[in-house]
């Protein structure tokens, strides 16, 4: 079994996964509704924090190190979230949803250590097998927020999509629809029972480049595969 599958929260701790699924569903019902999140995740985070009467600064700028995806910290009562915009947009979106979990824990569970000490998301925390329990939960929460099972099943019913380890276009369609990274979408469809363990294992052994090339060929989802290089650091001037 691929280590990414073996170590995902869905298999590693189903009780904890089910608790997170309920929390994510409640969060969506209160702060998102039926909307497909995609790049509105940045507004979702800010609106959520402000609704809880906390202050937040969401900073976006390109960092010349694509191993670094995002980080969050607390300074003088202000929550600072930084997103690396040199990453493909779908990675930025997932990184933001991951950081949302740390913020959620801080606000809802009074777990100040989650961001007072700083939360840093790197590529290995998403892309590799061995991650901390905290980041494993944050990855699961992010996927539950961005692509809940109910919306996946609804989209499958509408489109009649099928999923095999050899036909990648249906997978790419869902990556596009939910603005999810490749491996995250494979794991999500496995979690929803749309891929068997064997199929997911084959797909996770494939080079991501193969998927990206096919996406370009079909002109599907290319928007999410490009960096934005957005820079809003000027918004910090008021704090200096």
State where each predicted segment sits.
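Active-site hotspot residues in diverse enzymes, especially metal/ion-binding acidic/histidine motifs
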Residues: 1-240
């Amino acid at each position: 079994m691929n280590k990414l599958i073996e170590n995902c929260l869905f298999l590693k701790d189903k009780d904890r996964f089910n608790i997170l699924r309920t929390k994510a569903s409640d969060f969506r019902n209160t702060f998102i509704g039926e909307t497909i999140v995609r790049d509105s995740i940045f507004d979702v985070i800010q609106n959520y924090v402000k609704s809880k009467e906390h202050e937040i600064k969401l900073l976006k700028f390109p960092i010349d190190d694509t191993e670094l995806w995002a980080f969050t910290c607390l300074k003088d009562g202000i929550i600072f979230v930084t997103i690396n915009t040199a990453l493909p947009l779908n990675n930025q979106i997932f990184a933001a949803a991951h950081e949302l979990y740390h913020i959620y824990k801080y606000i809802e569970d009074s777990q100040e250590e989650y961001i007072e000490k700083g939360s840093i998301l790197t590529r290995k925390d998403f892309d590799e097998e061995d991650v901390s329990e905290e980041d494993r939960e944050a990855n699961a929460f992010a996927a539950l927020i961005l692509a809940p099972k109910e919306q996946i099943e609804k989209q499958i019913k509408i489109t009649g999509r099928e999923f095999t380890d050899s036909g990648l276009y249906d997978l790419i369609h869902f990556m596009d629809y939910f603005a999810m990274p490749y491996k995250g979408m494979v794991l999500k469809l496995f979690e929803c029972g749309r891929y068997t363990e064997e199929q997911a294992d084959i797909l996770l052994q494939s080079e991501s480049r193969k998927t990206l090339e096919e996406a370009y060929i079909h002109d599907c989802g290319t928007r999410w595969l490009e960096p934005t290089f957005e820079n809003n650091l000027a918004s910090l001037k008021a704090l200096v």
